[in-house]
């Protein structure tokens, strides 16, 4: 069982449930475009942690924990997979990728964002070589990005199961405090 298969088996439903809880705090309903924008924010946070040793310090939070930021990326990708109807029966095929971790998150994230904009009528439609439909491209990019994020955590010697669990607990508490 590879990293993506393990993550899907152990954490995918928890991620979807957590994102559903956040609906209580939303002023507007989130769709695939909104989730994609949040995914871009979280990928930026990974770059902040890895490339800027200072981190970002905001009132009440610091962006300096790679495990938490990777977990945030996985959370957004998990919810995006739910919104886009992605299934993971082929997760075993996503064990390696030609891109390095940061390169892959950036390039594939750009391709995913473009495809979601195209699907939603914000960009012109064009044929995608190697894919039967825009949905096939979206599904592929989500799975590849999840596998790359998990690989990044492994290379950093992180226990992403633990990190993801901590992030989910913290986020659940965040929602509970604000909806009490």
Regions found by a protein language model. Name each.
Residues 1-180:
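Flexible "arm" and connector segments at domain edges
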């Amino acid at each position: 069982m590879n990293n993506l298969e393990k993550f899907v088996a152990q954490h995918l439903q928890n991620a979807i449930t957590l994102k559903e809880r956040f609906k209580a705090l939303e002023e507007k309903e989130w769709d695939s475009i909104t989730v994609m924008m949040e995914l871009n924010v979280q990928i930026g946070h990974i770059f902040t942690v890895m490339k800027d040793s200072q981190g970002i310090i905001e009132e009440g939070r610091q962006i300096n924990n790679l495990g938490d930021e990777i977990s945030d990326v996985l959370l957004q990708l998990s919810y995006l997979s739910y919104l886009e109807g992605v299934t993971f029966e082929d997760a075993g095929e996503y064990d390696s990728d030609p891109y390095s971790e940061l390169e892959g998150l950036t390039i594939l994230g750009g391709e995913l964002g473009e495809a979601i904009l195209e699907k939603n009528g914000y960009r012109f439609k064009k044929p995608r070589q190697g894919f039967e439909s825009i949905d096939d491209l979206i599904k592929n990019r989500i799975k590849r990005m999840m596998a790359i994020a998990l690989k990044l955590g492994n290379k950093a010697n992180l226990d992403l199961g633990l990190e993801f669990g901590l992030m989910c607990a913290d986020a659940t508490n965040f929602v509970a405090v604000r909806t009490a």
